[in-house]
């Protein structure tokens, strides 16, 4: 999964959202009260808020999930997007931007530390229709900078480009959290001109990926996705940051500094080191250990010394 950090994402426990001004907060309260909302930091499910009986943009809500009335067929290609959650306003999913964050259902990888493991299954139906996103954006001009697609892994859905195009046509920029599972699809989307920014998770060195994500050949795909983004920089491709999430006593921690060093040598300008968190993860997973915080601070200092244009340490 991709939600900043992880992946419902990538890439992202409850992360406090920065307070908005009164005019923004008042305008968004109605959406937050009636919608299925998944909070995130880089892709981690922070909380689920389900309203009672309400109606959002003509879409009926019953029992806490939003469904099209009378099983009406999709009216546009983007209506096929399977959405597990929507945050009407986020300050943490795209650095320096105020965005709406869309959590897509399904991820082909199975990271053991995933904070959004409920979004890994690929056959679950969505709970938020694209019509609700469309209606939200119609009222948020001047209040939001853009929309971030996270997951799960948003690139696994064929209609992602259609949804991104609608966002751009509505006057907003598009951000993406990805674990790099689909380098060819990422290349196509980067070349389309629809993407403004990508948060790419590089979880480990290529040879150690199967131990992290539970899938063979996964490391090659993720590092190929990094090459895709680097190659796009000279031809109008999206800005991007690489994020590595670390777990105590694990290969992710052992690899982190070397991952950062290789990224810097390849020309990556923005890098983030993220501590995994126990909140929202599978039962039995723990992201704490004696001396772990101090170890992460030492890793952060080593990575910062590599000279990235922008480096951020994101503690748990």
Description of each model-found segment:
Residues 16-21, 25-28, 35-38:
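N-terminal intrinsically disordered, low-complexity tails
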Residues 75, 92-128:
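Canonical Radical SAM [4Fe-4S] cluster-binding loop centered on the CxxxCxxC motif
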Residues 123-126, 152-153, 175-176:
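Short, flexible loop segments at the rims of nucleotide/cofactor-binding pockets, characterized by
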Residues 134-146, 155-287:
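Conserved AdoMet/S-adenosylmethionine-binding subsite of the radical SAM
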Residues 103, 150-151:
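A secondary-structure boundary/capping signal
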Residues 117-147:
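Conserved alpha-helical substructure of the radical SAM core
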Residues 1-7, 13, 29, 33-35, ...:
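Auxiliary Fe-S-binding modules of radical SAM enzymes
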């Amino acid at each position: 999964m991709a939600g900043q950090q992880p992946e419902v994402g990538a890439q992202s426990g409850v992360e406090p959202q920065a307070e908005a001004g009164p005019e923004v907060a008042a305008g968004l309260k109605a959406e937050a009260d009636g919608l299925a909302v998944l909070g995130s930091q880089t892709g981690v499910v922070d909380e689920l808020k389900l309203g009672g009986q309400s109606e959002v943009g003509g879409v009926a809500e019953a029992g806490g999930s939003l469904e099209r009335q009378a099983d009406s067929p999709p009216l546009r290609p983007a209506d096929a997007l399977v959405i597990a959650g929507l945050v009407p306003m986020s300050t943490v999913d795209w650095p320096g931007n105020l965005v709406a964050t869309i959590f897509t259902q399904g991820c082909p990888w199975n990271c053991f530390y995933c904070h959004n493991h409920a979004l890994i299954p690929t056959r679950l139906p969505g709970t938020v229709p694209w019509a609700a996103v469309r209606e939200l954006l119609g009222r948020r001009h001047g209040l939001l900078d853009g929309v971030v697609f996270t997951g799960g892994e948003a690139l696994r859905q064929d209609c992602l480009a259609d949804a991104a195009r609608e966002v751009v046509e509505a006057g907003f920029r598009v951000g993406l959290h990805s674990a790099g599972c689909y380098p060819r699809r990422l290349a196509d989307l980067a070349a389309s001109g629809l993407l403004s920014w990508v948060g790419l998770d590089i979880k480990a060195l290529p040879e150690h990926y199967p131990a992290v994500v539970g899938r063979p050949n996964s490391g090659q795909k993720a590092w190929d996705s990094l090459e895709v983004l680097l190659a796009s920089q000279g031809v109008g491709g999206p800005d991007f940051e690489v994020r590595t999430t670390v777990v105590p006593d694990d290969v992710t921690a052992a690899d982190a500094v070397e991952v950062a060093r290789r990224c810097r040598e390849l020309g990556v300008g923005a890098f983030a080191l993220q501590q995994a968190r126990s909140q929202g993860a599978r039962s039995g997973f723990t992201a704490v250990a004696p001396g772990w915080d101090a170890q992460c601070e030492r890793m952060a200092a080593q990575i910062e010394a590599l000279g990235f244009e922008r480096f951020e340490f994101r503690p748990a």
